[in-house]
Every structure is written in C-alpha cells, then in structure tokens.
Design a protein with these regions (language model features):
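Histidine-dependent nucleotide/RNA phosphoesterase domain, centered on the 2H-phosphoesterase fold
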Residues: 2-211
Length: 211
C-alpha cells in the first residue's frame, strides 16, 4: 500500500475489536452518473449534504483512523468473499424520528439479500461496529422533512428507477469539520485495495463541498 501510514504497519487478523467512531464509515457510493439527480434533491433537503457524499452505509460508525492499518486487510478479505451485484434503486421511503423524518431512496428494490450478505460478511470482522442488533436496512438518505409522504412522492417522481453495479466498497473518514473523504476503494470479488488520498467528483460545487 505504498508506505501510507494510514494503511501500513500491521498484518491481517480474524477480527478487530475497536470501538467505533462516527468519523469513519464503510459505504457504497453510487456511480457518478447517478449523482446529479440525487444531489439536486439533497441540496434542497439534506442538512448533511456538505458532510457526506451520496452513500449507502454498510458499517457506521467504524473503527478510528489509527486502526485502518489493521482494518483494511480485514475489509479486503471480506470484499474478496463478496461478489459484485446489480442493485435497483427504486422507491422512496422514510424513517420517522421524534422531530422529523428522514426520506431515503431504496437501493434494495430488487431484494435485500445481496446487501444483507455483504454487510454481514464485512461486519463479522468488526464485531463492535455492527450497531445495536437492529435489522440492517440499506438506504440512501435524500433529506429531512416534517412531511415525509409529500417529499417521498416528489422524490420518487424525480428519480424514477435506476440501476447500478455494486462492485466496490469505500472506506471514508473525516477530520474536524471537514466532509467525509474516501480513503480507499476495495473491489468486491477480488479484495483489491486502491488508496485514495483525495476524491472529489467533478460537478457542482468545490472547496469542501460534495457535488
């Protein structure tokens, strides 16, 4: 991994029991051709649009950056066991919270099994990063609202049905108030690791903003 201190200096192990932090995550990022329609909605409705790229979280929070040297070989091993699959992104749903609702695009419209299998395969190696025992629901957040039915219907009409190949997972982290930045991309089926010191897709915005 080319001498990068984030990743070098430790060999693989079966599991890594490190306490999670909200400053890191393992996620799937949709291909860039899907970003404009998603980001147009997020800029209107998502207060986290400057902090997060469009994403489906698989492990959040994840281990702190100082553990990446040990975490990356485990992610690579899990990714190597997980074949790529085609996801259908269709339908907009919402989670209700006390003060608002989170509206989200469903990336598992073709069935949750491949997502669940991928999340389980990765999560087995990080037992403290698997949440609190709740059911894993893959989702791509679009925004917050007091009127989720109206916004969900509007977003569904704007987005329609999209498909994308889930062929890699991305390791993200942030420093201070900076956005979440991809640090590595890990290919499903092979476990190949590509280090990414910076990754800013072209398009709307710059200077620390996601497109």
């Amino acid at each position: 991994m080319n001498g990068d201190p984030l990743f070098d200096g430790a060999g693989p192990a079966d599991v890594l029991e490190a306490a999670p932090t909200a400053r890191t995550a393992v996620a799937w990022l949709p291909p860039q051709e899907l970003w404009p329609a998603i980001q147009d909605i997020r800029w209107e409705h998502d207060p986290q649009v400057r902090r997060w790229p469009p994403h489906v979280n698989l492990l959040f929070g994840f281990v702190p950056e100082e553990e990446f040297a040990r975490a990356v070989p485990l992610l690579s091993a899990g990714a190597a066991e997980s074949p790529a699959f085609t996801a259908r992104l269709s339908g907009v749903r919402y989670f209700r919270h006390r003060q608002y609702a989170t509206v989200w695009l469903d990336p598992a419209a073709a069935g949750p099994e491949p997502w669940t299998r991928l999340q389980r395969t990765l999560g087995l190696r990080f037992p403290l990063c698997r949440g609190h025992g709740g059911r894993f629901t893959p989702h791509l957040s679009l925004g917050r609202t007091q009127d989720p039915r109206r916004l969900a219907a509007e977003c569904a009409a704007r987005l329609g049905t999209r498909t994308a190949v889930v062929e890699e997972v991305v390791l993200l982290s942030r420093h201070g108030e900076e956005p979440m930045r991809p640090r590595a991309r890990i290919t499903l089926g092979t476990g190949e690791v590509r280090r990414l010191p910076e990754y800013w897709p072209r398009g709307r915005g710059s200077g620390g903003r996601w497109m």
